[in-house]
Amino acid sequence: MITVWCVCVGTKYHPAYVYALRDAVRDNLSVEHEFKCITTQRLPGITTRNPPVSYQGWWSKIGLFAPQVATGPSLYFDLDVVITGNLDYLVPFTEGTFAAPANWAMSGHGGIQSSVMAWKGNWHLPYESFNYPVDSERLWGDQEFLWELLGDDWKKIPGVGSYKYHCRTNTSIPDWLKVAAFHGKPDPHEVTSGWMSQYTSTLRSRISATTDDGYRLASSATG
């Protein structure tokens, strides 16, 4: 069975993002899977585990590769991706050591795009190789770290694009797109027009319906 992971640390993302991702994966991945979130938050209906590292921001993803975390075939999605198509094509990538999309920006921060990752589990090289805080101070982010660590020794995942580069100016969804990654602004829930808005409407509804304690969304998101 495949484990699908996300990471929710800090306060950047509303808890509704976890539920929206969980449901999008459920609707678009036909193989048996378990959805898990690395977080310290209470998220009713979501299987959670405490972060194995105390790193903040994108560095928290290093914890995915700690021993006893991902022990079998694994997929990972950033919370701010929007799933637009079937995900079954990603399953074979979980049988290899590591796979991710190529970085479409290539802005000098590495050629790996870590918004979607697949690996076989029990692969600890990033965790074992990361030197905190030295690496976090000299490198721009986890993508640059993975690029430095792996070079070209990884498989490229197709079907993942940038909302800014591949979606925002298009009048319809690109036929190749399965996952849209958001970076910078807007965040997915801030997209209220165009074809992308149909994929973000549920997320917006959950955010607007959430009570001050943040957990009314659980009653409508556990199905």
What would you call each of these model-derived segments?
Residues 121-223:
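Catalytic core and acceptor-binding pocket of nucleotide-sugar-dependent glycosyltransferases
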Residues 30-40, 74-77, 81, 97-100, ...:
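Short, hydrophobic beta-strand segments that form beta-sheet elements in well-ordered domains
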Residues 43-52, 59-111, 118-122:
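GT-A fold catalytic core of metal-dependent nucleotide-sugar glycosyltransferases
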Residues 30-32, 43, 93-94, 151, ...:
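Short, well-ordered coil/turn elements that cap or connect secondary structure elements
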Residues 1-57, 70, 184-187, 204:
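N-terminal anchoring/stem segment of glycosyltransferases
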